[in-house]
Amino acid sequence: MKEEEKTRLVIVQGPTASGKSALALELAERIGGEIVNADSMQVYRGMDIGTAKPSQEERRRVPHHLYDIVDPKVNFTAADFREHASRAIADIERRGKRVILVGGTGLYIRILTQGLVASPGGDDNIRRELEDQAHGEGLESLHRRLAAVDPVAAARLHPNDGVRIVRALEVFLLTGRPLSAFQEAHRFADEPYRCLKLGITVERELLYRRVEERVDRMIAEGLVEEVRGLLSAGYPATLKAMGSIGYREICAHLAGEFSLDEAMRLIKQNTRQYAKRQMTWFRRDSEIIWVEYPGKFDSILSTVMGFYH
């Protein structure tokens, strides 16, 4: 497909608490756009406060897509996201509107815009053995094992990212080839969209202060009650969705493992670390145009309008 024939996407990305949702909303109102979520946690129904979803008032201002689309018990994957997002984008374009993709899950954005890696299927027995090792010896042992056979993948993954560490080892044990080799061979060649990537840059101390304020606000708005309600409704702490930042710490607090103050301290600490990992991911993408928001909105709007014209 020729470049000029591709659907145009404005992508707003950056670390958590950087102001992505606010920028996406302001842009959508100014350019006749609709917002598509690219946050791996905001797809889940009933997980609202801890994922910092847009409010109902904000959603009434412009149409929002891919929020509250699956039950927390569903293991929603990057491939699932690509399928849902592709359909939403096609629908928005068909109605003559502009698409604004917003979120901090870099993998989702990359797979949507650059294609899926053709890697082998899974093996339940191998996965269970790896999960048993993680449970018995700790994730650090799995990460060291991965580093020995696929140092490229190990360097990309946080030592606590159990799901992806297990997957990378599973691929190696099934095929004898590192997962990074499959990714290198693929090189994410299929690019169906023409993209303008905007990244919000925030000075570190300001970002960390926003993180602290956001966590305090989540607790004040009822995060503990939200988690308690999910647990009571039959969503156990062992679910993948319930293991995300904010939910896992409150689950542990409700189980009597530590105080609410300690849970809040851990949420803030883990969120800061997550924001740092997000920035590391996004900084590797040379196509991102880094912008200041809200201070330089007029300049951002000018860049976006130039992209369409």
Swiss-Prot record:
Record-annotated site: Interaction with substrate tRNA: 105, 127
**EC numbers on record:** 2.5.1.75
User: For the region Interaction with substrate tRNA, what residue ranges are annotated?
Assistant: 39-42
Entry's InterPro entries?
Dimethylallyltransferase (IPR039657), IPT (IPR018022), P-loop_NTPase (IPR027417)
Catalysed reaction(s) here are: adenosine(37) in tRNA + dimethylallyl diphosphate = N(6)-dimethylallyladenosine(37) in tRNA + diphosphate
Question: Which coenzyme or cofactor does it need?
Answer: Mg(2+)
Primary enzyme class: transferase
Q: Binding positions for ATP?
A: 14-21
- Where along this sequence does the record place binding of substrate? 16-21
Q: Which GO terms describe its biological process?
A: tRNA modification
Q: Which domain of life is it from?
A: Bacteria
State one molecular function term (GO): tRNA dimethylallyltransferase activity
* Swiss-Prot/TrEMBL keywords: ATP-binding, Magnesium, Nucleotide-binding, Transferase, tRNA processing
One protein family per Pfam:
IPPT
What SUPFAM superfamilies does the annotation carry?
P-loop containing nucleoside triphosphate hydrolases (SSF52540)
Record keyword Nucleotide-binding present: yes
Query: What does this protein's UniProt record list under function?
Result: Catalyzes the transfer of a dimethylallyl group onto the adenine at position 37 in tRNAs that read codons beginning with uridine, leading to the formation of N6-(dimethylallyl)adenosine (i(6)A).
Per UniProt, subunit arrangement is: Monomer.
Q: Which family does it belong to?
A: Belongs to the IPP transferase family.
Q: What is this protein called?
A: tRNA dimethylallyltransferase
* Species name: Geobacter metallireducens (strain ATCC 53774 / DSM 7210 / GS-15)
Its gene? Answer: miaA
